[in-house]
Structures are given as structure tokens and as C-alpha cells.
Amino acid sequence: SIEAPLITVLAKMEMEGIKIDQSVLMELSNTFELELQELEQEIFELAGETFNINSSKQVGAILFDKLKLTTVKKTKKKTGYSTDVEVLTKLAKTHALPERLLRYRTLGKLKSTYVDSLQGLVNKESGRIHSSFNQTITATGRLSSSNPNLQNIPIRKEEGRRIRQAFIPKEGCILISADYSQIELRILAHCAEDEILIDAFNSGEDIHARTAVEVFQVVPELLTDDLRSQAKAVNFGIVYGMSAYRLANELSISRKMAKSYIDNYFKRYAGVRRFIDAIIEDTRKIGEVSTIFGRKRRIDDI
């Protein structure tokens, strides 16, 4: 009743494709290339020597052996220094080089994965990109997209929004973007039958502001944008089972404080706590969990 009717819809989407303004991508490619060259020179000047920026081993040697920056963590095999995003983000607070390296990596990925790659995927006959939408691959039942992944075109930063400008409607049409408002939390409120969450949604309240008031125990008049932002991270973190460790990293706070946020959340939203515990208990017994539409997912060894 859900998957079968969707097959025709997805087939039409794949056949239709989406129009691309290649001139936008070509201009972006040139712009990004120039900035990458400038970043490269900045990085070499900050390092005091030239090296392979794309080599984690050489980057680690510069940061930790030469510049003596504090080691955050080793690689998985414990054979060298980790220079992943988490490490560079922390180091960027103490030195300019890690920040420039992050910028270089981000821009390089945008250029290679999106700007340059998309140009090669335009169908010569239709002038459009025809992605594949995969209906039965993900364990959760969500759609995935490939060749290219049109569900993962960046949007959060300015460069990502510029890439999206290359996607254009055919003549006489417009592109419409629609999104459910806080759909995960609304479903959570419904399934958990949590009175506080339900009341907040029915009253048209800002759910993140409400959570900030409930979890951080502040009066609405003293609520700041920063507290609301933290409450948003807590709200969505709870939905996806985020640990105190992960929340601490997300908000740049101590693990103890992150745990207190989670504990306060469950104290205020007791219905959510009961719902999560019940789902885990039932899943352990029968080895599967179902959505409100009856779609089942097998989960062993929970």
C-alpha cells in the first residue's frame, strides 16, 4: 500500500530528471580553483614549508612534529596522528593552520564531488541529470539517490547554496522546496503520547524554545538564541539516540553537563522516556520494530 504505488512516481522522476545550468558550474569551478590555489599558498606559509596537503601523514607531521600542537587522537590503527575534521576543528582554536586546512578540504570536496562531477553527469540528449532513486536499499526504508546523489547537495553554507543555483526549472516552470515542520519530533510526540510535547505542538509553540525552558530550567524571558540552539541539538539528538559523549562534542560542553541535559530532558518529557524504554524492550523480545505505517525492520542483538 506504500511501496508499490511509489514505483511509478520514482520512475517518472528518473525519466524526467532535472535541468542543469552548466555555465554556473563552470564559473564555480574556476572560482573554487583560484581560492584553492590561494589557500595552498597560505597553508605553506603557515607551515613554513611545502608538503602534500592531501596526505594525512604529512599533515600530521607538520601539525604535531613541527608545530608541536597538542595531539588529540591517533589513527584507528594507532600508527599515526589523526587529522580528521574533529581533530582539526579542535586545533583551529589554537592555531591558524588547522582552520585553513579545513577550508581547503571543504572547498576541494565541493569542487570535485559536486561542481566538477555534476558536469560530467549531464545527459547529452536531454541536457538534464537523471539520478537513480533507490527504494529498497536502506534498512530504515528511506529513499537513497545515486549517480549522482541528489539528496545530498549541500545547502548549509554559502558555497553549497551557490551550487544549488545550477539546478533550474524548465521554461515556464518554477522549483518548489517543501519540508515538514519538525516532523521527527511531531511523530515522537504522537507515538510517545507525551503530554508536554503534544501541548507544545497543539499550542503552536516553538518546540526548541519550549525544550530549552524545560531542560535548562530558565524562564522564557531569559531564553537566548544560544540556549535555543543547544535545545535543538538535544531534541534531535534524543530522537536519534545520541550519547552524552556525542552531545558534548556537538555543543562543545563537558560530558557531565551533556548527561545532565539528557537526564533533564527525560525528567521533563517522561512520556518519551517510557516510549523509548518500551520500544527497546519489545524489540529485544521479538527482534523487530515497526513504524506507525506498519513497516517492519529486523534488529538483532539489541
Please name every model-derived segment.
Residues 209, 220-249, 253-262:
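Structured DNA-binding interfaces in DNA transaction proteins
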